[in-house]
Amino acid sequence: MQVAMVYRAFGKTGWRVSQIGLGCWQFGGAIMLDGQPDGWSGINDEESVATIKRAVELGINFFDTSDMYGWGHSEEVLGRALKEVGNRDRQY
């Protein structure tokens, strides 16, 4: 059984943003600090892209990312996935 996604108004922008968002920190992977990996590891880009695509299928259009997540790698992976989905203009 699939439940319909709930959307909320985003201020006065006219945007309808999914009530549930997807955090993208883990998609950035580990970064090197003092020669040691730090952060999330164990997920590859293909798994990340598949996860993002599934989130979009389920109605998620709100993604939390930062240039600090894998020194920008999370944003690159998110951009790639949304480009493949083909509706980047409706994602926030």
Describe the residue ranges of each PLM region:
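N-terminal binding-site loop/beta-alpha segment at the start of enzyme catalytic domains
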Residues: 1-92
